[in-house]
């Protein structure tokens, strides 16, 4: 009886070991397959995939923010008075000029929306000209790594080309005139410190910030939702993150 029990126990142990070995083989096979898939991608493949993701993101961003209330109706990118004008804003609201302040802020946002309509070609030119270094590092980085890389590499270029458009839209909707109404009233209050921020620069950079917010949104979609990978290169490149 004891010999039978020992024999049975040995069989159970043997089966358990065999099961564990088979499980390890399956896991090992999956890991190996993952490694093989990753090694099939070249640096150029990844660059092409990142470029396409940024292109799609730019199209999405421009469409989103250039619509009416694209900036003004989106809290995450709505343009408020420059920080150095916060005291002025608070003071004027207290003495009954809230609507005037709101009108000015709305005009800044509308200027950004109108300028964004012409931003796509500028963004696509920037994407085309940027040199993507460490493509695999960007691919395997944060959810907005490609967007942040593009921002770092192209903000000065975007600012240079977008600013004249912003100046034009500011003129069309009289942003400066609305600003003058605020500052004239505020500067007439005794003991206030006069302020004169560069609104053209400010609105241009805020326009760029808003565009990049939504480029990042689309990059996140492509990274995390297979259905957002609408081409073979996007599928091949971004499926690597799924392992």
PLM regions: where:
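Bacterial Sec-dependent N-terminal signal peptides
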Residues: 1-24
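A cross-kingdom marker for long, charged
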Residues: 25-32, 207-243
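Residue-level signature of catalytic and energy-coupling elements of molecular machines
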Residues: 61, 131, 226
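N-terminal Sec/ER secretory leader and immediately downstream segment
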Residues: 23-105
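Metal- and O2-centered redox machinery and metal/ROS homeostasis
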Residues: 39-42, 51-54, 193, 197, ...
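Second-shell loop/turn segments in exported
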Residues: 39-51, 94-95, 104-113, 123-124, ...
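An amphipathic alpha-helical core segment
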Residues: 165-206, 211
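Mid-length scaffold segments of soluble, non-membrane domains
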Residues: 98-169
